[in-house]
């Protein structure tokens, strides 16, 4: 039986990953939106500019779709394979940091969906790292 901290961390990870799927789905919808963006707040915050830029696609696949699939994969790993989840969350965080740099330095505009996803994946990484450490300690104490 798993300890309550492990169960709590698993629940938090699943909730965060589901939030990531939702935010990525909104960005995915924005990628194909031809109407004015609902999150075009001002000249510094505009999801339309970000999601229609050439940086929003990797090998003809929208980055938002990668996010949907990635968060779904991470959710499926929560509580089952903590070390693998932490490794994949780190890879996702590195990819996200690259996209954050693109928003900041190249596009010079921010997307609220993207920033939300950045916060979510950073939190997922930290919690999954903690879960992996606790899992390893539990195995060692057996």
List each model region and its residues.
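Membrane-interfacial helix-loop segments of redox and metal-homeostasis proteins
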Residues: 1-142
């Amino acid at each position: 039986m798993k300890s309550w901290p492990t169960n709590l961390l698993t629940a938090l990870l699943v909730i965060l990953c589901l939030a990531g799927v939702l935010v990525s789905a909104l960005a995915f919808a924005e990628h194909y939106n031809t109407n004015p963006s609902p999150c075009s707040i001002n000249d510094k915050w505009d999801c339309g500019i970000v999601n229609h830029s050439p940086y929003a696609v990797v090998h003809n696949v929208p980055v938002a779709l990668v996010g949907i699939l990635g968060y779904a994969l991470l959710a499926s790993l929560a509580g089952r394979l903590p070390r693998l989840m932490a490794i994949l969350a780190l890879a996702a965080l590195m990819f996200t940091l690259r996209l954050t740099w693109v928003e900041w330095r190249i596009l010079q505009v921010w997307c609220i969906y993207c920033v939300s996803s950045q916060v979510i994946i950073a939190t997922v990484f930290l919690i999954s790292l903690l879960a992996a450490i606790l899992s390893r300690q539990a195995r060692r104490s057996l």
